[in-house]
C-alpha cells in the first residue's frame, strides 16, 4: 500500500503500519476528529430514523425477522441532510483517509446501518464482490453511533485477511475451506469511535440479541478520480437491481 502523504494529527506511523498489516484501524473520537460533539451526531441519526417513505429521495431497506419488519439500512442520504453530507464527504474524512492510505478518493456510497434489536447477522463474506463492477478497490469508514458489542452483533474481522484473497463461493459467501482455522476478532466500539477497513476484509456479524439498537454511519470511497459521478451511477443501478421499500414509485431514468 502507498505510504501516507498527508499527515493527520490523529493518525500515527504506528496506525499506518497496523492498518497495512491487519486491513483495519480503530480510532477513538478524540483521534479521528470527524465531529466534536457525539450528542449532535446522535441527534442527526435520530432525525434520519424518522424519515418516512418519501419517493425519489433517500432509500430505506428493511428486513423481516421473527415476524417483525425492521428498518435495516438507509442509503443515499447525504443530499437530504447537510451535516451528514459534511461528515461523510467533507474535507475531514477525505484527509483522514488520505493520511492512512496516501490516496485521494471520492465517496460513492453513504448509509446508516440500524441493527435494531432482533436484527439479523451476516455470514462470513467480503464487501468487494458486491461493488466490484463499480470500484475494484475501495475503503470504508464506519462511525459508531451506539456502543458496538459482541451481544448486539458487532463486526468481526479476520486480521490480515485482506492479503489472502479469500475465495468466494457461488452463493457469494467465503468458501468454507478457507474459513477453517480462521479466528474472527470482535470489533468492540464505543459510541463515536470509527472503524476503517478495505474491500477485501473477511468479516461476519452476529444477530443483535439485545434490546438496544447498534447503529453506525458508513461512508464508502473509491480511488478513481476520473469518475466523480460514480455514486450517481451506482445508485441508479442499485435502484433497479436492489430496490428499496420506497422504490416502486421512484422514476428510473438511468441505464443499467
Swiss-Prot record:
GO terms for molecular function: dioxygenase activity; metal ion binding. The gene is lolE2. Its cofactor is Fe cation. Keywords: Alkaloid metabolism, Dioxygenase, Iron, Metal-binding, Oxidoreductase. Transmembrane segments: none annotated. Belongs to the PhyH family. This is Dioxygenase lolE2. It comes from the Eukaryota. Loline alkaloids show broad-spectrum anti-insect activity, and different lolines may have different biological activities. In vitro tests of NFL, NAL, NML, and semisynthetic loline derivatives with long carbon-chain acylations on the 1-amine have shown that many are effective against both fall armyworm larvae and European corn borer larvae, but the effects seem to differ depending on the modifications. N-Formylloline reduces the weight gain of fall armyworms by deterring feeding, and does not significantly affect corn borers. Dioxygenase; part of the gene cluster that mediates the biosynthesis of loline alkaloids, potent insecticidal agents composed of a pyrrolizidine ring system and an uncommon ether bridge linking carbons 2 and 7. Lolines are structurally differentiated by the various modifications of the L-amino group and include norloline, loline, N-methylloline, N-acetylloline, N-acetylnorloline, and N-formylloline. Its EC number is 1.14.11.-. It holds the Pfam family PhyH. Homodimer. The keyword Phosphoprotein does not apply. Induction: Expression is induced in loline alkaloid-producing cultures as well as in planta. Fe cation binds at residues 125, 127, 203. The keyword Iron applies. It comes from Epichloe uncinata (Endophyte fungus). Pathway: Alkaloid biosynthesis.
Amino acid at each position: 500500500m502507498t505510504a501516507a502523504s498527508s499527515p493527520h494529527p490523529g493518525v500515527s506511523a504506528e496506525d499506518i503500519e497496523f492498518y497495512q498489516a491487519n486491513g483495519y484501524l480503530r480510532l477513538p473520537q478524540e483521534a479521528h476528529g470527524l465531529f466534536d460533539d457525539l450528542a449532535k451526531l446522535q441527534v442527526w441519526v435520530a432525525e434520519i430514523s424518522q424519515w418516512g417513505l418519501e419517493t425519489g429521495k433517500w432509500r430505506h431497506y428493511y428486513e423481516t425477522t421473527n415476524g417483525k419488519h425492521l428498518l435495516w439500512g438507509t442509503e443515499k442520504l447525504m443530499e437530504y441532510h447537510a451535516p451528514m453530507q459534511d461528515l461523510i464527504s467533507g474535507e475531514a474524512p477525505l484527509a483522514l483517509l488520505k493520511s492512512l492510505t496516501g490516496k485521494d478518493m471520492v465517496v460513492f456510497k453513504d448509509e446508516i446501518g440500524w441493527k435494531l434489536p432482533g436484527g439479523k447477522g451476516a455470514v462470513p463474506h467480503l464487501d468487494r464482490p458486491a461493488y466490484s463492477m463499480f470500484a475494484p478497490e475501495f475503503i470504508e469508514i464506519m462511525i459508531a453511533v451506539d456502543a458496538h458489542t459482541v451481544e448486539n452483533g458487532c463486526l468481526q474481522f479476520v486480521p490480515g485477511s485482506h492479503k489472502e484473497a479469500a475465495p468466494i463461493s457461488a452463493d457469494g459467501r467465503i468458501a468454507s475451506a478457507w474459513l477453517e482455522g480462521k479466528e474472527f476478532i470482535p470489533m468492540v466500539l464505543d459510541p463515536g469511535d470509527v472503524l476503517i477497513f478495505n474491500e477485501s476484509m473477511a468479516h461476519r456479524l452476529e444477530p443483535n440479541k439485545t434490546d438496544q439498537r447498534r447503529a453506525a454511519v458508513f461512508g464508502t470511497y473509491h480511488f478513481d478520480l476520473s469518475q466523480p459521478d460514480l455514486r450517481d451511477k451506482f445508485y441508479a443501478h442499485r435502484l433497479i437491481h436492489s430496490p428499496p421499500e420506497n422504490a416502486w414509485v421512484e422514476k428510473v431514468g438511468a441505464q443499467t
